[in-house]
Amino acid sequence: MDLKQELATKGYAIVPNVISTEQVEIAKKLFREWQATIPDHDNVHAKVDPHGIYKYHHAGHTKHAWYLRTLPAVQAVYKKLWDCDKLITSFDGCCYIPKSLTKKDNCWTHTDQAPSSKGVKCYQGFIALTANKERTLVVYEGSHTLHERYFADRGNTSNKNWCKIDPAFLDTIKDTKRALDVPAGSLVLWESRTFHQNHYGKPNSEERMIQYICMLPDNHPKNTESMKRKRVKYFNDRRTTSHWPCPINVNGEQPQTYGDKSRLIDYSKVVKYDFPDVQMQEAIMKLL
């Protein structure tokens, strides 16, 4: 089964060996170096990054993120999917779950495509820097084909691109639930209608380290001149975004405080990476 057919049938796919063992180690080293720049990282990460997902601290513009986005082998998968020669990227964050974590899972299974949006619009993805089968992505196989009916039955016509799925409904399709066994170096893809969530798995089981990567064709109808200017601005400002390259939407720079000001991030202490290497600069600019 080819990749497009697998995505059309199952709603997800694991593409193994997209990056080499050496490239995995380079990215992991850069990832850990970035983590070390965040004061009191472990406590801060546990407190402000939901489900282990980095949304703050310029997480969309780390060295490891741009290293992986600009690798030809990663781009080649997206170019083949979209049958194009030129791509644009989101500035999505990354995810880290330490082996020592003992939190239990709750249900926040969701779809990232609005109820009002029909058909294939986007393929989300991540590069796995660790091998995982416990702390991993959970998907409901074939759920992308249920997206339209699910929301129609509930009279939901929202244009919001994040919608939680009713746990009672998920129980009716529990036989399609898959906790993915993901080798390091893989690119995991899923169609944005697919019902999915992160999964902690067993306590003290595995370290999980991934970089989210999502790309669309440069000639996408929503990639207007205004949108291109906005993406360049968000790059220059080092803003982290949702997974959609267009229309591009930034995350807030501060987490919810819930009255606790210690959760606020002091951006004067956050490293804002520059990319002085000319080849890297050129590779980045091609994706904006």
Whereabouts are the PLM-identified features?
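Non-heme Fe(II)-dependent double-stranded beta-helix
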Residues: D2-T9, P16-S116
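Non-heme Fe(II)/2-oxoglutarate
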Residues: T37, L189, T194-L288
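Secondary-structure boundary elements
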Residues: K79-I88, S117-G119, A128-T136, L146
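Short edge-strand/loop segments of extracellular domains
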Residues: K99, G142-H147, C214-H220
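Short, surface-exposed loop/helix-turn segments at secondary-structure junctions
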Residues: D105-D112, N161-K174, M209, S226-V232
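A short beta-loop-beta micro-motif enriched in histidine and acidic residues
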Residues: T109-C122, D175-T176, V182, E206-E207
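Short, conserved beta-strand element in jelly-roll/cupin
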Residues: S116-K133, D181-A184, L189, C214-P217
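Double-stranded beta-helix
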Residues: N132-Q197
